[in-house]
Amino acid sequence: MAKSSLAGSDGALTWVNNATKKEELETANKNDSTKKLSVERVYQKKTQLEHILLRPDTYIGSVEPLTQLMWVYDEDVGMNCREVTFVPGLYKIFDEILVNAADNKQRDKNMTCIKVSIDPESNIISIWNNGKGIPVVEHKVEKVYVPALIFGQLLTSSNYDDDEKKVTGGRNGYGAKLCNIFSTKFTVETACKEYKHSFKQTWMNNMMKTSEAKIKHFDGEDYTCITFQPDLSKFKMEKLDKDIVALMTRRAYDLAGSCKGVKVMFNGKKLPVNGFRSYVDLYVKDKLDETGVALKVIHELANERWDVCLTLSEKGFQQISFVNSIATTKGGRHVDYVVDQVVSKLIEVVKKKNKAGVSVKPFQVKNHIWVFINCLIENPTFDSQTKENMTLQPKSFGSKCQLSEKFFKAASNCGIVESILNWVKFKAQTQLNKKCSSVKYSKIKGIPKLDDANDAGGKHSLECTLILTEGDSAKSLAVSGLGVIGRDRYGVFPLRGKILNVREASHKQIMENAEINNIIKIVGLQYKKSYDDAESLKTLRYGKIMIMTDQDQDGSHIKGLLINFIHHNWPSLLKHGFLEEFITPIVKASKNKQELSFYSIPEFDEWKKHIENQKAWKIKYYKGLGTSTAKEAKEYFADMERHRILFRYAGPEDDAAITLAFSKKKIDDRKEWLTNFMEDRRQRRLHGLPEQFLYGTATKHLTYNDFINKELILFSNSDNERSIPSLVDGFKPGQRKVLFTCFKRNDKREVKVAQLAGSVAEMSAYHHGEQALMMTIVNLAQNFVGSNNINLLQPIGQFGTRLHGGKDAASPRYIFTMLSSLARLLFPAVDDNLLKFLYDDNQRVEPEWYIPIIPMVLINGAEGIGTGWACKLPNYDAREIVNNVRRMLEGLDPHPMLPNYKNFKGTIQELGQNQYAVSGEIFVVDRNTVEITELPVRTWTQVYKEQVLEPMLNGTDKTPALISDYKEYHTDTTVKFVVKMTEEKLAQAEAAGLHKVFKLQTTLTCNSMVLFDHMGCLKKYETVQDILKEFFDLRLSYYGLRKEWLVGMLGAESTKLNNQARFILEKIQGKITIENRSKKDLIQMLVQRGYESDPVKAWKEAQEKAAEEEDSQNQHDDSSSDSGTPSGPDFNYILNMSLWSLTKEKVEELIKQRDTKGREVNDLKRKSPSDLWKEDLAAFVEELDKVEAQEREDILAGMSGKAIKGKVGKPKVKKLQLEETMPSPYGRRIVPEITAMKADASRKLLKKKKGDPDTTVVKVEFDEEFSGTPAEGTGEETLTPSAPVNKGPKPKREKKEPGTRVRKTPTSTGKTNAKKVKKRNPWSDDESKSESDLEEAEPVVIPRDSLLRRAAAERPKYTFDFSEEEDDDAAAADDSNDLEELKVKASPITNDGEDEFVPSDGLDKDEYAFSSGKSKATPEKSSNDKKSQDFGNLFSFPSYSQKSEDDSAKFDSNEEDTASVFAPSFGLKQTDKLPSKTVAAKKGKPPSDTAPKAKRAPKQKKIVETINSDSDSEFGIPKKTTTPKGKGRGAKKRKASGSENEGDYNPGRKPSKTASKKPKKTSFDQDSDVDIFPSDFTSEPPALPRTGRARKEVKYFAESDEEEDVDFAMFN
């Protein structure tokens, strides 16, 4: 074998294949040759060139023809993927030369053109490129010219220096030489301007022959041209066929797309490709997705090395990728690198949108992606010389491809996600068909409680009916009835309540719903099968389904859900009369042997109106199927025609009706549907028309449209009634039933919650589970922060705390409750006579609504989700509402109000219309410590700890730990987290905003203020003022009705007493004789003498008659003209008097009662309805003061311990234990920043105004039973806080002029203080009509010194001068006179030294200046007389919210916050300090309530001194011998706590300094006044001595508003 003398070629040892040797041996044996092959023939060595030719697949791939799908470019079709037959080796040698040309672009950026020429006829291929040529110079080592070296000698390359980072395709030193070796002729032409020579040389016969190199002088532009004729015989080809040319053409297009800045000429024509994006269009143009829409390509040039395009693939994952211009047709790690990023983002989107419930894995997402990648990678590696799969690790790419969020967002909207979801839906359907479909079996096993029809699944299956019952008890009724009609054709299966709304259910829900799957299996249904013809119906086991549910609204809902189930999956079945229902009587009336059945309440009501002598009939209500006996069941089934109602399909309107009721897309239509229903019902009631009902005596069938619009709509309306409260009383029906029962029981002693629930169910006909009822009672009694502002029931026991948001309430078996003393003041008993009481089972139950004296729906808030609507209302301050009512009674507009949660110490600030920012409180104590002392409303302490602080402490994979430690010092009512963090992180957190970092801000949005109005219609209110005004008009009209009722009742009683007195006097005088006379004669005599039949009884009967006539305006004339006293005159009230009545004493007493009653009537007649209302408000506020005072006293007693009787010493309470729960006095308050939140709110509002639909949370699925208690925190509130029975003073709400919207301590508007010496009303001036003047409807407002408690002022007692007739002018004059007297009585007594009062009007709402050092208080303040000094230590700790937005302004200016006698914070009595509440000042908040009677301030010596000063500092009670321990933020130095451990947190120690001791004293130093007294608790000067009853000792508390609970019962 000849050896080539080619320089530089290495020998290769070739091992002969064993199979070849074996074959040669066998041949030798066959030839009877006993000689063996020589060793030399067995073991051979080949040159590298020989090896390449002998084993080409090692280098260029297979040289055998291969047929496969490839992207090619055909002249007539363009870029297309088709089956082609080609030789991979030939394709590869062409590609090597092409990639070399492209590589030159990386060496010379000036290269601009590549020319590719293919001549199939001549078998000539030429590739030309400009740019830097190959150096035409002799290689000094190899002694040959460089072009000859690199094209004509193996293992030569310019790419062997791996230290040099190159982004070229060449790597191994084989490429161009392989093309040379597999060509019959291979010519290289190049010109190098640098060396001023051109070079041309030709190799022939597989690089075995070489011509002489032609070198010429050259001074033109550099270029390189390779021309070769492939050795077709080596590739078993005769010519370059169409397929290989199409493939090579595509590679030319590849180069045009992947080489930036290079134009590619193909056979003399420029290819129409401009960049990579243009190249991608060759693949996707004219291609449509499954919906017929053109494919959308997402393109991003990530950087100069990465160009990525993405679109939808419908043929599994596809990729077209290039690495340094090499077509990596099998992909590689560069493709995975990009695709993994895309998949991870898309799968997040898919999971959010995936309602089917089928799990989606990354590879399934990848199957819908078509990606195009053009990248430059440094020194890439491949798994073979063919370079189809790039194997370099991403870390070695030399660059990163970071795709933008814009790219990912566009990718999620380009059709890929939709395609995935469609695939998921298809897969879900396949799974459903596999698991949930059924076939026709004669017997079914494995379904418990199924009583199968004997003929089901047989030849009579179409005649079989499956009865679906509501529960097991209904099944028993059906089985009893089957004794009449037989079991062959009827099967029974009980449902476990409401079935799934399959229209909106996920795939997972349907797959896992046993009930749905059981019905499918029993009936023999198959998903996606159309039951249009009779043949398909024969595949079913049952020909009909009969629905047998209770005749109530929940039963109607179950019917609707079953109709929806069949309609959604097999609509054609409805057209065949597949569904029917079995109805049972809801009421039976019987008399003697006559029995009437009624199938709807309206039908029964109509019958009652026309029947005489109703009492002769026995009425029985059937609330459920379980009420019927087995005997009645047999009667029902015996008369099957009467009780079976067929559902008849009437056309598209039926489809539309079912979709309307159950589709998520029909939310707005459902609102309109229910609104029209409520309006229709209201009009019917107004005109006395009967309500519509379905099941008359002649009803045999029913359309689906009628069922939805006349029966199912009752459930939807009922759902709203149970979920959404009434504007009038703020209650849902469950809450109203509880209150009704409590009023009726009128317990004077506490009762167990569990027992009360049973009583409610009995007295008010409650038809649901008692567990829900018990939770309603518990929620009505809760009073922690974030629950009720006024709890109508008393929480005697553990009713839940702010730690867990009420979920930590004890079992109802262990806790007690009873009515609050405020309940009957809010809901006066006399108003019960005006209410419309409802009847259930012929039993008188709760009224349609109660009518409180103030809108409870605002005080305790409301929340609920119904059908089509949702309701959300925050809490508001009771006193603020009282003040607004008083303003409205005076004809003034109500002041705007901000939400207010009792005992909440944070701030609530307005962001926009009905949008508020709720902020907790955080203080910076030192360089690495912050203190959190309040959380946003309804952010529960435990939840906050677990969801916010724990992740901050432990960190996550993505975010490092922010804090190093935290300690907890809170109680069940207060919050205190002491958080440690590094100085650097604290600085960073403060720069970012501590409230934001610690998640201490939430938003409260009130755009769903939907309530039932007094007519029972749902109405959406835009503002709280709208609610208040509508309530005001209704309540005022009811005060008029109350007055009418009282005048009538008192008049009747007066007449009765007058008749009794006259009768006694006439008997004594002998004018009347009754002895020995018949009853008839006596009655006739009394009538003749002008005595009236019992006036009280007659008046009551007249009232009842009037009510009946109002309810039944359409009755006959004869029934309406019946006498009010059909039994004749009633004189028992006279004739039944005892003989004792004839005595002188009794006669005088009777006459006195008569005269008193007459005066009462006259007095009442002189009062206006507004007078009655004012009296009720005054009584309520007075009792509210007492209740809150008692609450504070209870807290104080619990915190300070009991003092030993007779001793003044402090109780044994550890100082540090009390201090550690209190805020540090040295912290720097962080002002909540809401600028960004305001901007965001403005953007949302603007967007909404542009036409965005209302975003209301609605219940769209009817398959969930109403739970009554929506999840706490709904969209607007992330974490929900609760409230303490505050141990610290209540944050102060400061009043601002209208226009400012930050809640602070309420002050009078525009009123100035007066000096004590003048002894005149500081507010009295000539402008008595001005809005700021004190009027009888407005409370007396006492200015408050920022250091001293406000003086006790007497509460004005409202007195009505009834000596004059009721006339407007006279009344106004009286009011004015009374007012002047009231003003003088209530004048505040201020210190002589206090000359000026700075009203709060001028304070800026964002002013949160913090006074950390000495106060700027004027010397006059510190030099107050001894009386005021003795109050100095009171309320020495502020709540964290005290340093409110204008605290320092208040301190610096000696501002006296004018607070009403009925202070809205706590309702303190006149001597009680009005705590501040930074629930952000209410806009133009009016002065608080009017005060009934002012009381004298306690003398100094009567200060309670037995209470420990430590605990005093917590509640504001001073101890003479110690400095106060308070929440004050100033420089007041505290006594050292005794702890020597500097590292431990000590709330009593000032950071970085030792607390200096102060001498014991009872008054404050001037320097310390401001810091010790927060804006919440400032002492006030005592009132001047005056006559009147002495006031008992005052208990001072730190809390403001009463223990309020947000009505969590409102969620029931």
From Swiss-Prot:
Its main location: nucleus. CDD domains: HATPase_TopII-like (cd16930), TOP4c (cd00187), TopoIIA_Trans_ScTopoIIA (cd03481), TOPRIM_TopoIIA (cd03365). There is a cross-link at residues 21-22, 165-166, 216, 287, 355, 361, 425, 427, 434, 588, 593, 623, 631, 634, 664, 700, 1080, 1202, 1205, 1214-1215, 1238, 1250, 1259, 1311, 1315, 1385, 1427, 1443, 1477 (Glycyl lysine isopeptide (Lys-Gly) (interchain with G-Cter in SUMO2)). The modification Phosphothreonine is found at residues 1280, 1390, 1562. One of its GO terms (cellular component) is nucleolus. Residues 1322-1332, 1346-1358, 1417-1429, 1443-1453 have a biased composition (Basic and acidic residues). Residues 724-1177 form the Topo IIA-type catalytic domain. It catalyses: ATP-dependent breakage, passage and rejoining of double-stranded DNA. ATP binds at residues 100, 129, 157-159, 170-177, 385-387. Mg(2+) 1 binds at residues 470, 550. The modification Phosphoserine is found at residues 1224, 1324, 1328, 1330, 1332, 1346, 1363, 1376, 1387, 1400, 1411, 1428, 1439, 1441, 1448, 1453, 1460, 1509, 1511, 1513, 1537, 1539, 1563, 1568, 1600. Keywords: Acetylation, ATP-binding, DNA-binding, Isomerase, Isopeptide bond, Magnesium, Metal-binding, Nucleotide-binding, Nucleus, Phosphoprotein, Topoisomerase, Ubl conjugation. The modification N6-acetyllysine is found at residue 3. GO terms for biological process: axonogenesis; B cell differentiation; cellular response to ATP; cellular response to hydrogen peroxide; cellular senescence; DNA topological change; forebrain development; neuron migration. Residues 464-581 form the Toprim domain. Disruption phenotype: Knockout animals have B-cell developmental defects affecting multiple stages of development likely due to transcriptional defects. These mutant mice have altered splenic follicle structure with reduce marginal zone and follicular B-cell zones; immunophenotyping show decreased B- cells at all stages of development. Mutant mice fail to mount an antibody response to vaccination and B-cells fail to proliferate in response to stimulation, indicating deficits in B-cell function. Its cofactor is Mg(2+); Mn(2+); Ca(2+). It holds the Pfam family HATPase_c. The active site is at residue 814. The modification Phosphotyrosine is found at residues 1358, 1408, 1596. The modification N-acetylalanine is found at residue 2. Eukaryotic topoisomerase I and II can relax both negative and positive supercoils, whereas prokaryotic enzymes relax only negative supercoils. Key decatenating enzyme that alters DNA topology by binding to two double-stranded DNA molecules, generating a double-stranded break in one of the strands, passing the intact strand through the broken strand, and religating the broken strand. Plays a role in B-cell differentiation. Homodimer. Interacts with KIAA1210. Interacts with PLSCR1. This is DNA topoisomerase 2-beta. It comes from Mus musculus. The gene is Top2b.
